[in-house]
């Protein structure tokens, strides 16, 4: 995107102005938000000298805490979780993807209401579609990592402290196993997950990062047992992602489905193990970036199948 001369001229003009900037609304995948959107915004602000005081982040589930912005707005204060989920599913049906490749009509109608509540009359919108437009060549295998990294700036992700009302063990493993196309909730995988989590719980307390909300097409595996506690019941739509990140930041390690939560764990510099059954219907570039980032941060990161994990265990004795 930086190489688009006319877009570059536009951003430089914006940098010289004092107009407030509404960033978002982000309503899509957690992994893309942490792996690409946040570092893309950081690089954009750095390149054009945009002050954080001008930025209002619009996201959901309390994830505004992760943004280096003067303030944040939660989508769920304006739109129910079910309607945001329905919008994602409509996008998927229309384009085959839930990625925000373009601004939708309902987003265009919502933003003026948010601006009015913020007391803004003249403002600029930085929509996620701009990031997707710039990084699509990477997702499609037409951009090298060296060029990709000119678009991204990885900085520490700020997270809130967990509330005092949430009892957490001194040391624990955060766990989030959920159904997705690479990790379907069939009997074989469900049995493996139940056994794996129970084995971990024999060694160290387990805290499940489950919300009880149906914000997307992911469904948490039902887990319970000795030394296992759940975040469900302690979260609301407006704070569920903030709470999950707060707990994850306190964890000793993360284990779960390979995907967005593991990518957040890597961003938070937590050792992680993420699992898939078949690597289909997802972009290999995201796995590359997750592993690359873990190497840069010096954080252990395993991504593989149960058989891969079994092989590592056997070869190490």
Question: What is each stretch, according to the model?
Answer:
Residues 99-179:
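A nucleotide-sugar donor-handling region in carbohydrate enzymes
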Residues 6-119, 243-246, 261-264, 275, ...:
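Active-site and donor-binding regions of nucleotide-sugar-utilizing enzymes
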Residues 231, 262-317:
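Nucleotide-sugar donor-binding patch of glycosyltransferase catalytic domains
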Residues 74-86, 235-236, 295-310:
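Short acidic-hydrophobic, aromatic-tinged amphipathic segments that line or gate anion-handling sites
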Residues 249-255:
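Acidic donor-binding loop of glycosyltransferase active sites
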